[in-house]
């Protein structure tokens, strides 16, 4: 179903459409050189079964948060670690991601400190947020959903994560572990995690829909493969 059809059917309101548009914008590919194209991963449904360690140097979590209803603040977290378990059995697939909240950046130092403050993340008390889950379900040939647990600001809630397996890299040197890439998206309401009480997001019915769009791009190296 296209975005136009969804909007025509009234399934999304303006705020949900804005969050979806943000996800589409952030997911747009950037220009690549011929050399970069040769390093693109190959597409497949899921990576080979085994355990994979997230490469924190090539993995990032992005967010787009509503600012006083009408504005939008974008930023990212630069320290993402964790593990991914792939299996031929979707019920056995798992993910364990840890994000260093203090690594967030919106490119405005004063705003970053505000977001790190007790009004929002309160990083001194809650230095990390996590996403953990086991079991996935297919929603299209290369799209999956995991109903994992997001723990943020000391509050844990089940949050569906939609993701795609982008593929396995083909230019890995002999002796080095296999490398795979994923892209995931989700959305949350900050009020449900006890954050942003001063933002007045109850206007226009904002509290009924996600006001923060989240994306995560991950590269991970195999640590174990089936024999």
Residue positions per predicted region:
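Bacterial N-terminal signal peptides
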Residues: 17-29
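Bacterial N-terminal signal peptides that target proteins for export
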Residues: 2-20
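Low-complexity, acidic/polar, glycine-enriched regions of mature
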Residues: 33-227
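Intrinsic disorder and flexible/low-complexity segments
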Residues: 3, 28-31
